[in-house]
Amino acid sequence: MSYQTGMAPARAMEDDSDVEEEALVADYREQVQYSEGGMEEMDQATLAQQADEIQSRLVQASQPLDFQATLETKFASYDNYCALFHYILNSEGPVDLEPPTYYWAWDVIDEFIYQFNTFCTYRARIARQAGNEEEAQILRDNPNTWGCYSVLNVLYSLIQKSQITEQLAAMKRNEDPMAVAGPYGSKNLYRMLGYFSIIGLLRVHCLLGDFSLALKTLDDIELNKKAMFARVMAAHFTTYYYVGFSYMMMRRYADAIRMFSHILIYVSRTKNFQKNTQYDSITKKNDQMLALIAICVAFHPTRLDDTIHTALREKYGDQLLKLQRGGPDSLPVFEELFKSACPKFMSPIPPDFDKPEANIDPIDHHLSVFMEEVKTNMWSPTVKSYLRLYTTMDLKKLAGFLDVKPEELRSWLLVSKQRTKQLRWTENGLLEGEPVNVSDLDYALQGDLIHISEAKMGRKLVDWYIRNLSRTYA
């Protein structure tokens, strides 16, 4: 079983990719119907035949840890993961085991990173509070338990052992991936763990704040319906969330909106085919995605899909208006939405238990970085509202309207103009892209004279009617 079906070359996701979305929905519907039938019977038979200690560990590794788990239980869970991955990676030759279920590999990587994240958050909280000396001492004596290096080492080792990057590269060249898979990569267990470890690295690097490296990890994975992650709903959602958030923190707002919009539309179209437990867990994240879209739209005004636009107005209508108006009143709204929708950032190193005041909350750190960008663009809506009224305007006159010094306004105009030039992803690596002007308002400074031009795009009514008619009569 390969991770991407077919041998078609890479193709970029278009803005109005309704055909792509419908294909994803149809593909997911078939998978759900299949998994609810013979797949469950096959999984039960497999588990019944392989009920030994290792097989039990395989099943246990994908089970969520109780939210109220004690520190001892968290340590034991880490030891179990270490034993399992040591057996898989360091045995003499590839282990002859089949994954218990189709979704097992994703569940294991997902739970492994989740426990790592929650443990780091818990450890940082104990260090800041400095109230529970007994637990603080245990954590102080075990700095390598759930350490960042250990987790990254597991993920990179699974990728290297499975030769998954070589397999994906071969598939892009329309070659046989099994020719480069090696003895480990030819096994389902290693191939699936290696593949989802790439998605796991995207997540971990984003949680650590290295957004460029997070996107770089997906160089060998194509963001389309043929990708393996698109067949596992939770993996699909996670991938686009972290890619979109990384783009947002890199100020590539147009690309961030595309990623968030894609997955929200997909979720809305597949909700009738979701199993209740899976859908409930994903819909809890929908509000976060909408909050991030609201932030991105404030920086980069653009048209949204009708489904997203309606949901955004219903959930964040008042906040969106404040964001779009800009000014000091928008700052608390930006802060509120960011803190409610951002990942649970963590530090790559253990906290200092002896100096609690020296420990900085990673979320507060990234919030401060983000708010600096917000403050830079805070007056953008107001300035643009004046510029739209003129074709030429004196710099000092505009500074008088805004009650700022001319040189401060000049600096702001130069920074704002630079922000309108962004990379827009089309194909190949996610860090690559074509430079485009993402604003319909452009201007140039000639001494103290501002030359202004505005490009007004007419709405494509024909496309709008066709799209809505197809939805109505489908």
From Swiss-Prot:
Component of the eukaryotic translation initiation factor 3 (eIF-3) complex, which is involved in protein synthesis of a specialized repertoire of mRNAs and, together with other initiation factors, stimulates binding of mRNA and methionyl-tRNAi to the 40S ribosome. The eIF-3 complex specifically targets and initiates translation of a subset of mRNAs involved in cell proliferation. Pfam families: Paf67. GO terms for biological process: formation of cytoplasmic translation initiation complex. One of its GO terms (cellular component) is eukaryotic 43S preinitiation complex. Residues 255-449 form the PCI domain. HAMAP family: eIF3l. Component of the eukaryotic translation initiation factor 3 (eIF-3) complex. Belongs to the eIF-3 subunit L family. InterPro entries: eIF3l (IPR019382), PCI_dom (IPR000717). Coiled coil: none annotated. It comes from Chaetomium globosum (strain ATCC 6205 / CBS 148.51 / DSM 1962 / NBRC 6347 / NRRL 1970) (Soil fungus). It is found in: Cytoplasm. One of its GO terms (molecular function) is translation initiation factor activity. This is Eukaryotic translation initiation factor 3 subunit L. Keywords: Cytoplasm, Initiation factor, Protein biosynthesis. Its main location: cytoplasm.
